[in-house]
Amino acid sequence: MKKVKKIIVSFLLMCMLCVGMTCVASATAAEFRFSDPQTSVGAEVEVTAKVSSAKALNTIQATLSYDKTKLRFISGDDATGGDGTITISRNDENAGTTMEFNLKFQALDEGTTSVEVAKVDGIDSNGVAVEITSGSSSVSIAEGDKSLIQEEDT
């Protein structure tokens, strides 16, 4: 009987210790998706990039790439760059489950090109890393007016 009591007490102590152990938080899953706009040479075009998650987001940092012979980056929400690369960086504790970035380009040449995610990192509102699945934007550029193309500021 003493042996059974020791086993039961040992088992209960182990159960109590397990309750106090910290849990490893699993990463939040999110998607980084883009609009697929159509435009013409010389015109400005807006590509919308949107990060959506089941949990509230806090921080997104991304590097995007694009073909600088087809598109010229003009401006964007929390975005800087040019020459084929854009950096997006936003830290917003009140963002909720989505963050949206509007990126403005000028179309330079006919054809189809893309804006793609080269690298992306995210943190949810609990400080946990977000696993982000990335897509890309397909931008269709039709014939247009090359005289509208503005030279980049140097």
Predicted regions span which residues?
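N-terminal secretory signal peptides that target proteins for export/translocation
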Residues: 1-4
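Acidic, low-complexity intrinsically disordered segments
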Residues: 6-7, 11, 18, 23-154
